[in-house]
Amino acid sequence: FRGAVLLDQGEFSLSGSLRINASGIVLRGVDKVKTILLKKGVDRGALIYMEGTDDLKIQDTLQVLSKYVPVNARTLEVASGTSLRKGDRILVNRPSGKEWIASLGCDIFGGGISALGWKEGDMDLTWDRTVTEVNGNQITLDAPLTVALDAKYGTSSVITYQWNGRIRECGVENMTLI
C-alpha cells in the first residue's frame, strides 16, 4: 500500500479524467456528501481511470475435464500434466457456444431480426482466481465460480498467465462523483 490522497471537503471541478496507474493508491474524501468531484465539459469518458499496463501474457491453457461444475464450486478437474501450483493466478474461461445461447433463447430477439441475437463467443465468462490447492488433476480455487460449467455447452478452460503491469489494491472512497 503506497498511501491515500486525501481531498478535503468541497467541490473539485475537473476538465478531464483522473488516472491512477500504480498499485496501492486510494483517492479518499473526508465525507461522501461533502467531498465532490465534478467533471465539466463535453468529454464523455470516465471521471476516474484505474489502469495498469496491458501486458497480459498467456502461459498455458488447460482443458477442464469435469463434465459439470455447479454454481459455487471451488474445485475442478483439469487435463493431466498440469504444472499448476498453490498460489498460481489463473483465469477460468467458460465459452458461450451456440447451444448455450439457443438454450437461453438469446440467439434471436424476435420480429424476424436474427442479427441482434448473441453470437458465439460474445458472452464468454472469465473468472480471475488463485489456486489454493492442487491434488493430482484436481485444483481448488480461492473463490467459487458464479455460473455452472457444463461440458454440453462447450469445453471450459483454465488459463495460466503473467501480468506484470496489472495494478491492485486501489480505491476511491468517501466522495460523490458527478
Model-predicted regions and their roles:
Residues Y68-N72, T82, M123, N164:
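Short, well-structured alpha-helical patches and their helix-loop capping segments
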Residues I25-R74, A79, T140-S157, G171-I178:
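Right-handed parallel beta-helix/beta-spiral solenoid domain characteristic of secreted/periplasmic
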Residues N21, V134-N135:
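Structural motif
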Residues G16, L65-K67, E120, Y161:
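Residues embedded in well-ordered secondary-structure elements
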Residues F109, I113-D128, T132, Q138-I178:
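Cys-His-centered catalytic/binding microenvironment captured across papain-like cysteine peptidases
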Residues F1-V26, V30-D43, T82, P95-W127, ...:
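N-terminal extracellular ligand-recognition/capping segment immediately after the signal peptide
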